[in-house]
Amino acid sequence: MITEDYVSFETAKLLKDKGFDEPCLYYYFSDGRIGKRKGLKDRNCSSVNTFSMPTLQMAMKWLRGVHNIVIVIEPHKYDYINEKNSSYVASLWQGDNYYENITSKDYPTYEETADAAIKYCLENLI
């Protein structure tokens, strides 16, 4: 079964700080607990200490559309015994600028790499 993957709590807080305001079904409370709306809504309210919880792809699409940042995630190492990728790295384009291997380490999953790359963009490029 395919499931959705969401940004981490730390990344959600950074997204709010950088102006992310897209409607999301899920959100984080200030203590990291997860809440769910009955309908889509922007949960980055200034009056309530909640943080919208977008999917990784939604956050990456927002970075592309609003900040012209394209994240590229690639396999870095291959486990020939188990016949699968064993780590991933991320690079990105921002306009004509290319940043190679922006994540400080290899991550074991595509999703962890995506979250780290989004966080890097929010902390260093926006």
Which residue stretches match the model-derived regions?
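Catalytic phosphate/metal-binding cores of nucleic-acid and nucleotide-processing enzymes, i.e., regions
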Residues: 4-9, 23-25, 40, 104, ...
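GGW-centered surface loops in extracellular recognition modules
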Residues: 1-3, 7, 13, 17
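N-terminal segment of the canonical double-stranded RNA-binding domain
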Residues: 13, 17, 21, 30-108, ...
